[in-house]
């Protein structure tokens, strides 16, 4: 596994981040496809054995049970100082309503730390932009979380570049803790972030940790092939309902490049992301250890410029999605 600094921080993270949305009690929350604790723990352990030290979860994943499962596994399988743990705040959890008010942020971080069984998280991220709370209130509360030692750094996710630029400027003006990472929706068939967000992050030294790097499984198999997970994944249906013949052509070229390299589609799709400047660690999700082993090998693949061009050429602009 390769490791890089996360933006301007002193955190060194693996080139792949393990997304923990998959881990959670199926009877909690709104995703019936999640893995219960006994099925989640072996995957987390295998990730650690494979060199992954970066784990991303959220307060809302499976109504908090993702944080509980991840926290217990990391306590059992790793030393706290050897892992980088990121969580998020915004969505409703139990009786905590959706939002980023000061009260919501301060309660949420305490609840997350309790569920994780940790004294601090390395990164507390705002999951979405809150249109009902003044951004100054949100940013000052996040700064207070850092000052209290409950989060080492703060990050953001899924917003317009103009909003992110506004937040960064306010943080500079007030001397508040600045966002060090942006978790955005970015993959071979959704590249709208290349227009404004990625250049902004590169300019500001903000690390990019893309979510859905494999388009929720669509870049791992022949185009149009379905699975039980794809059928039941309402989020994925909303994200990729505008997919068209250009996306199918990209998927076809992905198959060709992967065959040329003797690699899998998923490995090449991740290698493409890792070739982009400013990309710290794509967030991978997996439900089986053998899938994880496959993805771990992506860090060893280097694409040639002509292969990158082959994959990128068919892309056409898409409607902006992923901010809700």
From Swiss-Prot:
It comes from the Bacteria. CDD domains: AKR_EcYajO-like (cd19079). Disulfide bonds: none annotated. It holds the Pfam family Aldo_ket_red. One of its GO terms (cellular component) is cytosol. Gene3D superfamilies: NADP-dependent oxidoreductase domain. It catalyses: D-ribulose 5-phosphate + AH2 = 1-deoxy-D-xylulose 5-phosphate + A + H2O. Coiled coil: none annotated. Keywords: Oxidoreductase. PANTHER family: NAD(P)-LINKED OXIDOREDUCTASE SUPERFAMILY PROTEIN (PTHR43364:SF4), NADH-SPECIFIC METHYLGLYOXAL REDUCTASE-RELATED (PTHR43364). Belongs to the aldo/keto reductase family. Aldo/keto reductase 2 subfamily. Overexpression supports cell viability in the absence of the essential dxs-encoded 1-deoxy-D-xylulose-5-phosphate synthase. Overexpression confers resistance to the 4-amino-2-methyl 5-hydroxymethylpyrimidine (HMP) analogs bacimethrin and 4-amino-2-trifluoromethyl 5-hydroxymethylpyrimidine (CF(3)-HMP). This is 1-deoxyxylulose-5-phosphate synthase YajO. It comes from Escherichia coli (strain K12). The gene is yajO.
